[in-house]
Amino acid sequence: TQIVNGVLTNQGVIPSTSPAARLRGGSELQPEESTNYTLGAYLSIGAFDVTADYFFINVEDRLNLSSDFTLTPADLATLTNQGIDASDISEFRFFTNQFETDTSGIDVVVSTDTEWLNGITNWQLAFNITTTEVVDRDPTLFDNDRVLLIQDGTPGTRWNFTANHNINQWRLLARINYYGDFYDNEAGGYFDDALLLDLEAAYTLDENMTFTVGARNVADEQGCSTSSCGTTPPSAFGLPYSQFSPFGFNGAFYYARFTYNLD
């Protein structure tokens, strides 16, 4: 049971070969077939180490859930004549192979070390851009909303920049994480991009003991709410934030850790 437009609705995932699914084009599932290519390079440019990787993945007969379907009175009558009572299913969907996607992207990592402030800082920038396109589909099984979820349901761009400074017995870390915007089909719209900051400090007491304190998402970023992002409805399943958020919606997380090495 799920909430659809504020109403409790019986909704389920049924076998693709069940009589109800066959009325909407369901069939036996087939193995996915994929072709992928990768190309990588490493460069040392002065004090900088650079790695770059390109990837391309084509998936035919891709497995995913279909769009949501309802049964008409004529459908219910057809199933009843087959001895099947489907009156308690208001909406349903099923797994299907009826679409094909192309996914491509680039990963770049740049790192270097700097001696300063009586210690050494390792700097690292990791960048990713990924795009997915639905290149073929059966529109009766896979509607435009499902296409948007596959293509834009995760951020197309992500990067993080990390500074890790070591000085005597101390290690200090700061990291900025960026997530691009993404689509949530349940909320009916796009959610804004976001920047998160992580901080950590560790002190090595001796060769066996280390004490660490830190915080993930220091600024307590929860992402924009469904209403502030302009999505419809103003909440999805009662959640004020997207259930698909790549960084969650619980905000800041603080921790302390003591490590003892038995060696």
Regions found by a protein language model. Give the residues of each.
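Outer-membrane beta-barrel signature, preferentially recognizing the C-terminal barrel domain
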Residues: 1-51, 57-58, 84-106, 111-116, ...
